[in-house]
Amino acid sequence: IKKVKREISKDSFWALKDISFNVKKGEAVGLVGKNGCGKSTMLKTIAGVLTPTMGTVKVNGTVAPMIELGAGFDPELTARENIFLNGAILGYPQEMLKERFDEIIDFAELKDFVDVPVKNFSSGMTTRLGFSIATIYTPDILIVDEILAVGDFAFQKKCEKRIGDMLNSGTTLLLVSH
């Protein structure tokens, strides 16, 4: 990240101003701060969801962003359909998603809800599905923006283990919390 600025409105409110840092492969970096200080904006900029108003962001490798609850999901589609939609958005090959479909559903604990539209899911169910899809493939960079807080304790522990396994495999982690 080099001299990144992100203007939110034309009234000169800068969510990010002159932010510069480097993260090495395999590092785990936490961004901590008050609400509204720019943490989520920074992660969205790194993930390519937002573009900086000024400055540059250079990312080497594949990114699995877990930024907003339900991002990349169509609420009218079923969990099954959303696995392929969200996987395509993340750049995962359809063949790989087919091969690992059961693993995604099993990790998300949604076997009985595969053919239910996501609009009927609780926030925890949506989080489980999103995390399971994003982490079925070991990315170079995993971005997690506070969304795991909505999952239950047992699922949070499963996520922590999977993230730990990814870190041990060399994945870089960017994590936001308060």
Describe the role of every protein-language-model region.
Residues 132-144, 150:
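A short, proline-enriched helix->beta-strand linker immediately N-terminal to the Walker B motif
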Residues 32-34:
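The feature captures the beta-strand-to-loop junction immediately N-terminal to the Walker
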Residues 1-2, 84, 96-113:
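Conserved ABC ATPase "signature" region
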Residues 47:
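Helix-to-loop junction immediately C-terminal to a conserved catalytic motif
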Residues 156-169:
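Helical segment within the ABC ATPase nucleotide-binding domain
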Residues 1-18:
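Pre-NBD coupling/linker segments of ABC/ABC-like ATPases
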